[in-house]
């Protein structure tokens, strides 16, 4: 099998596939004013999703994560899961969700073939959760995480965007929460975007602060599998849960990059903070275009840069994280 490899010998096993940029939350670090449609958009159809996922599978992709926006806003979300999972080469099919539909739908997603779930929970304080997300749905999301375990998921990942003077002093509360639960809690450093410069300057804090606290408390870093995301994961014998740290401003963060992104409009993005994407959609209309689609993906990858330029304050075309799913 051909394996996607770039000019810096990095191998790519992981595709983050956005299926919508619509979201019903108004998170302060992403869409503080809520989702505002910019004209009429036509997101990838079920057939187009099938074709792009199949092409990446033929290029060695083992893991696909469905992102948004909020992926479950798609009425055909369960069908999307089932369609991708028909391909045995895709060993892991994950979703990142705000969790508001978990209680109702997670068992159905599991039955359709979903293998992994990430849920965004930036605070364990219901009032602060409401303030961050613009939605009074903390308890509904918590019930949804329980529903995921009931549906048969043996682990749930929970994402929390780390923000100074918001949740950076809540480590002990989060640790108490995951001690009896098989939850991998992932602290994600706040990243600068085109629309979020002021927020970044006010609230960014390095994940290294959390890492130092974990090491002092006896947590140990574990090795990463080839299709894992960018988190540094820590475990402790006294805890069922784990802690992950995603620190894009850390030296050599990009050296282990193993993932590519396709937007809900069918553009290939080589980096979350890259420039204009490469269109794939004109090659998603027919199965007969598969060879040409594969060739375009391979050719485009050779232009991927060695690193992002966040340290220079350059966030590329990413205006907010709903744009291509973070």
Curated annotation (Swiss-Prot):
Catalytic activity, EC: 4.1.99.22
Residues that hold [4Fe-4S] cluster 1 according to the record: 23, 27, 30
Chain residues that bind [4Fe-4S] cluster 2: 254, 257, 271
Residues involved in GTP binding: 16, 65, 96, 157, 259-261
SMART domains listed in its UniProt record: Elp3
Cofactor mode of binding and number, as noted: Binds 2 [4Fe-4S] clusters. Binds 1 [4Fe-4S] cluster coordinated with 3 cysteines and an exchangeable S-adenosyl-L-methionine and 1 [4Fe-4S] cluster coordinated with 3 cysteines and the GTP-derived substrate.
One term of GO molecular function: GTP binding
Biological process, per Gene Ontology: Mo-molybdopterin cofactor biosynthetic process
Entry keywords, A to Z: 4Fe-4S, GTP-binding, Iron, Iron-sulfur, Lyase, Metal-binding, Molybdenum cofactor biosynthesis, Nucleotide-binding, S-adenosyl-L-methionine
Record-listed S-adenosyl-L-methionine binding positions: 29, 69, 120, 191
Pathway: Cofactor biosynthesis; molybdopterin biosynthesis
Pfam families: Fer4_12, Mob_synth_C, Radical_SAM
Catalytic activity of the protein: GTP + AH2 + S-adenosyl-L-methionine = (8S)-3',8-cyclo-7,8-dihydroguanosine 5'-triphosphate + 5'-deoxyadenosine + L-methionine + A + H(+)
Cofactor: [4Fe-4S] cluster
Ranges where the Radical SAM core domain occurs: 7-240
UniProt-listed Gene3D superfamilies: Aldolase class I (3.20.20.70)
Keyword Nucleotide-binding attributed: yes
EC category name: lyase
NCBIfam families to which the protein is assigned, alphabetical: moaA (TIGR02666)
Protein's job: Catalyzes the cyclization of GTP to (8S)-3',8-cyclo-7,8-dihydroguanosine 5'-triphosphate.
UniProt subunit comment: Monomer and homodimer.
Family per similarity comment: Belongs to the radical SAM superfamily. MoaA family.
HAMAP family: MoaA_B (MF_01225_B)
Protein name per the record: GTP 3',8-cyclase
Organism: Yersinia pestis
Gene expressing this chain: moaA
């Amino acid at each position: 099998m051909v394996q996607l490899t770039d000019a810096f010998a990095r191998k790519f096993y992981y595709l983050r596939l956005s299926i919508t940029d619509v979201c019903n939350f108004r998170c302060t670090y992403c869409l503080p004013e809520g989702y505002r449609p910019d004209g009429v958009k036509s997101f990838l159809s079920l057939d187009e999703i099938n074709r792009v996922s199949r092409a990446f599978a033929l290029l060695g992709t083992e893991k696909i994560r469905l992102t948004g926006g909020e992926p479950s806003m798609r009425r055909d979300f369960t069908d999307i899961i089932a369609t991708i999972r028909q391909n045995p080469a895709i060993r892991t099919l994950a979703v990142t969700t705000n969790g508001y539909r978990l209680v109702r739908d997670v068992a159905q997603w599991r039955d359709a073939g979903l293998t992994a779930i990430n849920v965004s929970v930036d605070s364990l304080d219901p009032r602060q959760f409401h303030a961050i997300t613009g939605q009074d749905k903390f308890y509904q999301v918590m019930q949804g995480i329980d529903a995921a375990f009931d549906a048969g998921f043996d682990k749930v990942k929970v994402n929390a965007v780390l923000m100074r003077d918001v949740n950076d002093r809540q480590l002990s509360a989060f640790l108490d929460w995951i001690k009896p639960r098989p939850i991998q809690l992932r602290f994600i450093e706040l990243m600068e975007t085109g629309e979020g410069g002021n927020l970044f300057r006010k609230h960014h804090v390095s994940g290294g602060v959390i890492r130092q606290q974990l090491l002092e408390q006896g947590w140990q870093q574990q090795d990463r599998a080839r299709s894992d995301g960018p988190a540094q994961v820590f475990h402790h014998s006294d805890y069922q849960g784990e802690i992950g740290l995603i620190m894009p401003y850390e030296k050599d963060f990009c050296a282990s990059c193993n993932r590519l992104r396709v937007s809900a409009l069918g553009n290939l993005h080589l980096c979350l903070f890259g420039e204009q994407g490469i269109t794939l959609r004109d090659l998603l209309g027919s199965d007969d275009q598969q060879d040409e689609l594969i060739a375009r993906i391979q050719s485009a990858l050779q232009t991927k840069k060695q690193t992002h330029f966040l340290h220079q304050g350059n966030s590329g075309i990413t205006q907010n994280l709903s744009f291509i799913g973070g």
